[in-house]
Swiss-Prot record:
Subcellular location: Cytoplasm
EC number: 4.1.1.37
Record organism: Polaromonas naphthalenivorans (strain CJ2)
Superkingdom as given in the UniProt entry: Bacteria
Function summary: Catalyzes the decarboxylation of four acetate groups of uroporphyrinogen-III to yield coproporphyrinogen-III.
Name of the featured protein: Uroporphyrinogen decarboxylase
Pfam family, one: URO-D
Binding site for substrate: R28, Q29, A30, G31, R32, D78, Y154, S209, H339
Length: 369
């Protein structure tokens, strides 16, 4: 059904296998910084018009790959499709971000929640299959979802938040309601990601965008535990091929030792984390060792080309000597930003970044000889 994969560098790095260069892709690589994305979005009429139309979703997913020699594609969708399928009424006002028509703020609203019928998300799975076919084996396709906690933040707040007052009030005042919501979210996310795998996703990523706003104990109880609940239900392989699982908690650097215990292959890091320390903590050989993904500050892309190249080299050098032994697994890095790319990024800066990652990571391997 799908063409054989020509560039498996990303998947190999996820599995801590040696590669001839460090693979690179970018969070939000299909997005508003690209003029061709804006043109397609204008045709679609709205963000959800874009995300729910298979042809448009396929078109925008492939746009960055037409421009740049990236090593992976990521499904064009939104982390909030699952609560939308629960009936919360997702919409996107231009320039305002996501909003739910019916937020979940009391016991009655929580009691109404249930794992949605995955047929309501058929448009996502159709897009996955369409994109995988359109890729023609060029690079792997990553599927994704928001984490149970991050979904809960939006579901309770009704939109993005500066202080997370409403969701944290529920967490502290009615932890029973929060646990109930998170359990439903976790089971829904697991079903959703497994359906993406069935449809053709070759890796899946959980975005815990708001895990970092929690106090230490609350992070472990309300975020990490439910991310683990998702992972425990995910398919390890599909048709005999391993499906790597990636977890990214923005602001989660202080919890790497706890996150090392997660049943996943890759941990994403934001730009505040020292890669060498992260590698020593979770990336070296031993039980539960993880591949690491990250972690350039997205704002580096507003600098001049020479500075971008220098910062890329600094991130690669910080990770340390690349793993080159083809006979065994070892510490690997997937290059990415430490958060999503800014919509104001000059597109030519991304070209500089991708080429710099490939060139410098190859030269590091040559030096090791």
């Amino acid at each position: 059904m799908f063409a054989p994969l020509q560039n498996d560098t990303f998947l190999r790095a996820c599995l801590r296998q040696a590669t001839d260069h460090t693979p690179v892709w970018l969070m939000r690589q299909a997005g508003r910084y690209l003029p061709e994305y804006k043109a397609t979005r204008a045709k679609a009429g709205s963000f959800m018009g874009l995300a729910t139309n298979t042809d448009y979703a396929t078109e925008v997913t492939l746009q960055p790959l037409e421009r740049y020699p990236l090593d992976a594609a990521i499904l064009f969708s939104d982390i909030l499709t699952v609560p939308d399928a629960m009936g919360l009424g997702l919409s996107f006002a231009l320039g305002e971000g996501p909003r739910f028509a019916t937020p979940v703020r009391d016991e009655a609203a929580v009691n109404k929640l249930e794992v949605p019928d995955m047929n309501k998300l058929r448009y996502v799975f159709d897009a996955v299959t369409s994109i995988r076919k359109a890729l023609g084996g060029r690079v792997p396709l990553i599927g994704f979802s928001g984490s149970p906690w991050t979904l809960a933040c939006y579901m309770v707040e009704g939109s993005g938040s500066d202080d997370y007052r409403l969701v944290k009030t529920m967490l502290y005042q009615r932890p029973d309601l929060m646990h109930k919501m998170l359990a439903i979210n976790a089971d829904a996310v697991a079903l959703y990601l497994n359906a993406q795998i069935e449809a053709g996703a070759q890796a899946v990523m959980i975005f815990d965008s708001w895990g970092g706003v929690l106090a230490d104990a609350a992070f472990h109880t309300f975020s990490l535990a439910y991310t683990a609940r998702v992972l425990s239900q995910l398919k390890r392989e599909h048709k005999g091929v391993t499906i790597p699982r990636l977890v990214f908690t923005k602001g989660g650097g202080q919890w790497l030792e706890s996150m090392k215990q997660l049943d996943c292959e890759v941990l994403g890091l934001d730009w505040t984390v020292n890669l060498a320390k992260a590698r020593a903590l979770v990336g070296e050989n031993g039980p539960n060792a993880k591949a690491l993904q990250g972690n350039l500050d997205p704002n580096v892309l507003f600098a001049n080309p020479a500075q971008i190249e220098a910062e890329v080299a600094a991130v690669l050098n910080s990770f340390g000597a690349p793993h080159t032994d083809l006979t065994q697994t070892g510490p690997t890095q997937i290059f990415n930003l430490g958060h999503g790319i800014s919509q104001h990024t000059p597109p030519e800066s991304v070209e500089v970044l991708v080429r710099a990652v490939h060139a410098h990571s190859r030269s590091l391997r040559k030096q090791q000889g």
